[in-house]
A protein has these predicted regions:
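An active-site-proximal structural segment forming one wall of the substrate-binding cleft
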Residues: 77-82, 86-89, 110-131, 181-196, ...
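Active-site groove signature of glycoside hydrolases
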Residues: 93-95, 101, 109, 137-140, ...
Length: 420
């Protein structure tokens, strides 16, 4: 940008600034000149000449002195009043007389949960529930709209400024896509599990894009051929080293140590695929399972039964598990049903097999709605989970968090929050 131009960046979905709290700002810049940075309200960042209304008296002047290379500059702000506004954001202005390139503009509160970047009140809400494990990073994002947009855990670690940005499956619009910066990546998820005393349960892509969106997933845009599957299996093997490895000559152990965590995370579970189903899935899953069990026999592997509580894909999955129970420690079931369905199916697991190695992991479940009746129906259903704890070894309500006014998914959510 050239003087007297600048940029105004609204904090994503707005933010709350608290009087007396500190906020760490950073920017990567290239060139020689001055940047003036302040906090304020962005009236309309889409205008060619945007309007801003500063609310913090203190502004910072950053002297940029790297002509040819990118350099990171940082400054800390202390908010001098309270502000919660839809337009709250960062104003960066070039006050010098030369061109400057800027990238990776960041503003983070210093007061976060255990100093690891996550919002303290949300983590404290989660902590109060005494969770035993966390399934991450979620569901369909792992699969991707196509294989090119599938989540790759290796893109989500290391310096945040160097992580590969990726389109999110929940809004893949070509004109207004929802992008993932991977600022919350696998390292942060492992760290979150450690901070909250949870077992990490990462889910990896199995070489198949989202089957719900792609139908039969028969072309290479959506389905990795068997003779090209090995890199995906290697990703799983490398993740085990990243999480559990102690050999400091290993590339992925080195990366974990470089990020500040010398000790292993002691991961015990890995899920292969999110809601995949059918013969094309189990053909690929078997290759993952054989190689992982051969090298890391103590890792518990999670397979999946698809997207429904019953039907052909669910039946096929359990029939496969009955014949290959040595390859799967958990069967991940997902279903979102009506409140009446949950009330009527409290006895669902009474007749499941008990003499098999493959136990149930109810990885996603919720009744469709957010009324008291939904909660009561789910509670009734959960009595069946507890009664059959020898069959249902793990269960996780989903989704975990939802922000008021900013959800794509409204069928059910566990913890609702706003800016404050």
């Amino acid at each position: 940008m050239t003087e007297p131009n600048g940029i105004a960046i609204k904090v994503h979905l707005s933010a709350e600034f608290k009087n007396g709290e500190k906020y760490d700002f950073s920017v990567y810049a290239r060139g020689e000149g001055e940047l003036t940075v302040s906090l304020g309200i962005v009236i309309d960042e889409h205008k060619a000449s945007f309007e801003v209304e500063p609310f913090n008296e203190a502004a910072a002047v950053i002297k940029c002195n790297s002509k040819d290379d990118w350099k990171k500059y940082s400054v800390t702000f202390t908010a001098d009043e309270e502000l919660e506004s839809d337009g709250s954001g960062i104003i960066v202005t070039n006050t010098g007389d030369s061109d400057l390139d800027v990238d990776m503009v960041s503003l983070m509160p210093e007061d976060t949960y255990k100093g690891h970047g996550l919002r303290k009140d949300l983590m404290e809400q989660l902590e109060a529930m005494h969770p035993k494990f966390l399934r991450f990073p979620g569901g369909c994002a792992v699969e991707g709209q196509t294989m090119d947009t599938a989540w790759n855990w290796k893109d989500t670690i290391g310096d945040v400024s160097e992580r590969k940005e990726m389109i999110n499956i929940w809004n893949p619009s070509a004109t207004e896509p929802y992008m993932m910066t991977y600022g919350l990546g696998f390292y942060e998820y492992f760290q979150m599990c450690e901070d909250l005393g949870m077992e990490p349960v990462p889910i990896l892509n199995c070489g198949i894009a989202c089957q719900v969106r792609s139908g039969s997933a028969t072309d290479e845009e959506h389905l990795v051929p068997m003779d090209k599957l090995q890199p995906y299996i290697d990703d799983a093997l490398d993740l085990i080293e990243f999480a559990n490895g102690t050999d400091e000559s290993n590339e992925w152990v080195q990366k974990r140590i470089q990020m500040g965590h010398k000790e292993p995370f002691n991961m015990k579970y890995i899920g292969i695929g999110n809601e995949q189903y059918g013969d094309i899935y189990f053909e690929r899953y078997e290759e993952f399972a054989k190689q992982i069990h051969e090298k890391y026999p103590d890792i518990n592997l999670v397979t999946t039964s698809g997207t429904a509580s019953s039907g052909s894909s669910n039946d096929l999955a359990w029939n496969w598990a009955n014949e290959h129970e040595e390859l799967a420690d958990r069967m991940d079931e997902h279903y979102y049903e009506t409140a009446d369905w949950f009330r009527q199916h409290a006895y669902r697991y009474d007749n499941y097999r008990r003499d098999t190695n493959t136990k149930v992991f109810l990885g996603e479940y919720a009744s469709k709605g957010n009324a008291w009746y939904n909660a009561l129906s789910e509670a009734a259903f959960m009595t069946g989970l507890e009664r059959n704890a020898d069959v249902v070894r793990m269960a996780s309500y989903a989704p975990m968090f939802a922000k008021y006014g900013n959800t794509q998914w409204s069928a059910a959510d566990m913890i609702w929050f706003n800016n404050s």
